[in-house]
Regions:
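A contiguous, mid-protein "functional segment" used to position or interact
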Residues: 89-133
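Ligand-binding loop in jelly-roll beta-barrel domains
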Residues: 20, 57, 77-103
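Short acidic-glycine-tyrosine-enriched beta hairpin
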Residues: 62-80
Length: 148
């Protein structure tokens, strides 16, 4: 299992494309308070998110949805989206992307962590610039104007 700090969050790759004949990827994401990725869209993958703990606000297109434990949401490809931990403690998500491939972007954009107990690293300006620069190779656009 690969564990990566990406966008200030900790992502554990539970199943990667090599495990699923490239059909899907399953990841566990730990978001500190205020954590979550910048607004972006995928040209290749659809995503689902199941909130395992905490409170997360999802922005999918023009729709804003606040979810707590057990909440589930779909983020289709080609639709801008992002999410924020809007609770007071850590939030945990189970994320599925299909087809597989987004995990290779996370590995390229993030930094390896030793295990699932490690805390995510700070998301620096250099990390943001790198993420924006490499995202197109993976069919992803990082949207620089954040509404929320």
């Amino acid at each position: 299992m690969k564990v990566i700090s990406v966008a200030g969050d900790r992502v554990a790759i539970l199943l990667e494309g090599a495990d699923t004949n490239q059909q899907y990827t399953v990841m566990e994401a730990l978001l500190p308070p205020g954590g979550g990725p910048p607004p972006h869209l995928h040209h290749r993958e659809d995503e689902t998110f199941l909130v395992l703990a905490g409170e997360v606000t999802f922005y999918v297109g023009d729709t804003v949805t606040v979810l707590k434990k057990g909440g589930f949401i779909f983020a289709p490809r080609e639709i801008p989206h992002h999410f924020r931990n809007t609770g007071t403690g850590e939030a945990m998500l189970l994320e599925t992307a299909f087809p597989a491939g987004v995990e290779t972007f996370f590995a390229a954009a993030g930094k390896p962590l030793p295990d699932r107990n490690a805390q995510p690293l700070e998301f620096t300006r250099e990390d943001i610039a790198n993420m924006i620069a490499i995202a197109p190779r993976f069919g992803i656009e990082i949207l620089t104007k954040e509404k929320n």
